[in-house]
């Protein structure tokens, strides 16, 4: 932490103020994404024609396997892992419903019930699609004492699929908890004795299971794994690579537009104390939805994300308590007339928020969805009030109880805020009823907020305390329960496991809201696992984050 004396003429009777500057690293990207060169139109059109032809071929293959459930499940799994399932949503939905009805409802089993890989794949794909198939299907793989059979010890492929399936568990499924421990322990012991590509798959899954991975990043990883298997479907792989490159061109264009907008605001100069993370913010939102139909949604959410990131830093890395009260009141009034009452340095931020919201409001009016703006403004007011409460705690050096901390920290995690904003550009499915459901704070939302807050606290605790930030959840828990930091981390891990089960329960049919809306919640949660698993990669952009961004926005696939 560095206390700097900064003159503020707009605050009466104070010529200079001491501010706890965080010294965030600057952006590493410069103008890297400012200048986007469009691909040749003829080449683009040719790729699009190839994609359409290959899509038809895959549809025919899915239809041809209707009476071969395992073969069909393998095709569905490959399309999902390769990031092209969005092209076949109806076909996949019909196929899984058919498999569910004919292998579970009628037979209460899967035809390959003595093959661990087949049963685990069947279980995982149906659970992912919301079907509450019973984990009793794994009974065949346990002995009379309830332990998993020793004969499974060398079935690496089956163990890997079992491991992936266990991450779809919900509360009360102790068998899957046991299966996770069994599969994980055994995979860890044999991974160094496996051959490529299976060994690489196991290492990757042990670090990040599919359920917690971002679909777009998982696709990049899976391309080379899938290609290494001689049995891979050449049409699927070619389609996936072509589609990846077409989408990458779209995403780079979007980011170029965003980067020019961001530079026009000149926030890096006006708010040098704040994190300049436009590119990382776009990557975050790209994790929420990458599909082409959500281009407007990405633009809206990225712009608002950039605003709230700056506001967050004003509250916890620069503003004085008196200044923050003025800003909080201005947000509550939501009126351009409030500009005159703000310190000079705050004015560009406040005006930009109003401008961004006015731009969104115009778009919502054109869509006949103006009602959404009420919710968008309410979450902004709520999160800013939360930031204000945290600033008071910090100013007073107050360490709340863990329960008191979490009640506020869930709000300032920003995940109800981001989920609300992510719905704005999603078209007709984002109904008034969907927003009311979201504002009722259902368990899946609280779980997403909890994962966000707990992972953030675990990864950034030391840095935040060094710079005099508000007490973190780790600190509050240690003080209240008289435990060491390691014990607090263990408790947080247990809470993360519980929260993921809540997420999974929220995805069981019947859905509370349309599945695409639930998917935004899941993907926002997945982003946290990617960015905050071991460190705060948003604040401190290191190799892992650079590589992830490059893989999605710089490096094309070789077809």
From Swiss-Prot:
**Per the similarity annotation, which family is this?**
Belongs to the terpene synthase family. Tpsa subfamily.
Q: Does the keyword Isomerase apply?
A: no
Q: What is this protein called?
A: Sesquiterpene synthase
Q: Which SUPFAM superfamilies match?
A: Terpenoid cyclases/Protein prenyltransferases, Terpenoid synthases
Q: Which residues are recorded as binding Mg(2+) 3? A: 464
Gene Ontology molecular functions: magnesium ion binding; terpene synthase activity
Positions binding Mg(2+) 2 in this chain are: 312, 316
User: What is one Pfam family matched by this protein?
Assistant: Terpene_synth
Q: Which UniProt keywords apply?
A: Lyase, Magnesium, Manganese, Metal-binding
The biological process GO terms on file are: diterpenoid biosynthetic process
- Indicate which residues the UniProt annotation says bind Mg(2+) 1: 312, 316
What Enzyme Commission number(s) does the record list for this chain? 4.2.3.-
Motif DDXXD motif: which ranges?
A: 312-316
Record text on cofactor binding = Binds 3 Mg(2+) or Mn(2+) ions per subunit.
Q: Which domain of life is it from?
A: Eukaryota
Q: What is this protein for, i.e. what is its function? A: Catalyzes alpha-humulene and delta-cadinene, as well as beta-elemene, the thermal rearrangement product of germacrene A and several other bicyclic sesquiterpenes when incubated with (2E,6E)-farnesyl diphosphate.
Taxonomic classification: Eukaryota, Viridiplantae, Streptophyta, Embryophyta, Tracheophyta
Needed cofactors: Mg(2+); Mn(2+)
